[in-house]
Amino acid sequence: MISSVQNVSNLSMTRALGAVDTENSASSSAATMPGTAGAANGVSFASVMGNMASDAVNSLKGAESMSFAGIKGTATTREVVDSMLQAEQTLQTAIAIRDKVVSAFLEVTKMQM
């Protein structure tokens, strides 16, 4: 997907968007199909959630270290703010997923057996 975005951003004003090669668009459309990515790779839901949790922790640790670097004067204000905004977005995503998991659990407990 990133390569597709880079290809679109590299287009000049005189070229049409149709000039983007079809290989990248085909690969990006296949990657967005909901049922095929996990089934083809054999990736479990637990491993995806575990990877996401470790990425969230790494993002928060990176923001913390960047804030310390900002206090020391070795990082610019922009770098600190970008790191903090990324950590905030990661935290908001984790909170939203937690809320969905809790609501799904509550729905399951309400089911009659």
From Swiss-Prot:
Localization, UniProt: Bacterial flagellum basal body
Chief location category: other
GO cellular component: bacterial-type flagellum basal body
One record GO biological process: bacterial-type flagellum-dependent cell motility
Superkingdom of source: Bacteria
A Pfam family this chain is assigned to: FliE
Single GO term (MF): structural molecule activity
Keywords for the protein's UniProt record, in alphabetical order: Bacterial flagellum
Protein family per UniProt: Belongs to the FliE family.
Protein name stated in the entry: Flagellar hook-basal body complex protein FliE
The organism of origin for this protein: Rhizobium etli (strain CIAT 652)
